[in-house]
Amino acid sequence: MICTGKFCLEDNASGGIGFGILIGSPVRGAFFSRFVFYKEVITSMDIDFVVTWVDMNDPQWQVDFAKYSGKKGNEKNGVSEARFRDYGFLRYWFRGVEKFAPWVRKIHFVTSGQKPEWLDAHHPKIHLVNHRDYIPEEFLPTYNSVVIERYLHRIPGLADHFVYFNDDFYIINRISPERFFRNGLPCDIAAFHYNPSWSQWYKRIKNNMKIINRHFDKKEVMARFHDKWFDESYGSKARWNYLLKGYGKFITMRTPHNAQPFLKSTFEEVWEVAGKELTQTSGNKFRAVSDYTPELFRAWQICRGNFEPYNTYQDTKMFPLMIRPKKAAKAVYSQSYSLVCLNDNVHIRNYAKVMGNIRESFEHILPEKSSFELS
């Protein structure tokens, strides 16, 4: 970046030019040396966003859900309501995109055929995607997020570079295309994380690693892409990389639970080598220990060296609302990060109050309707 006075000209890695105004050089810990307000970003790289959403208040969805889950009304079973309930913040997701990431080419809004009444389906940047548009018919309906996610590369018109969002991932501060892609590659952190847990989530991650270890030699990968595995920006997040450098197998990787950049070609390649396993488990209508998660595609990307090293923890944060509701509301209000995950849980106490506080924080930073909302 070349700066003269308060104006900056940046030669973007994607091949475009970004023009901005340098508005300050505040430091937050060791993470940020400056903030740049981008007035305009011109890039030759098309980047799409994909966001998945479900409206559990839809009567037809409730009927179908009860049919396949065996859960009626408020009955309890192994299927958590928190995985599906919508707490009314989706409009802030769209407002955040328009205000803080206006450079996005297209938003692929993925549902089982639902649409919020307020959403402008005819907006030129919105592509409404029904599960039936890209998931094989024999696996529908599905209530398993990992099945919905593993077929994303089949979405019609999806750009080769895309960022995947759950509907609880929010952009709350200005963010540039280079935060997600540099030199045509996803920005990510390659770091191990030892997790001795035997939870269902961990078992699914182990399923991923079986495929990774079958196709990659860990020592060879870490030697070939040494600088990417030991990038100085990782700091203490890379400590297990040093401890496990001589270990022969890949183990659990650190997973920043937030917006994830992908190459569409990564999905296509994984399907070529692991299509049998992915197809066999696509019939799981709800989460199961036999599943493979989207972390498989991310890990494959990393092992291929198809990423640019970036400590994603420096500007993202996941807030479990069951234990950190006040910190979550404060982070949104003060825009402490670029990206946040507001992780719901069926056991949240004072649910209405917690969500009310977060809504107030969103209204503070995103009070105006976006062009995605009907007037």
Predicted regions located by residue number:
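Generic short N-terminal amphipathic or hydrophobic helices
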Residues: 1, 16, 20-22, 41
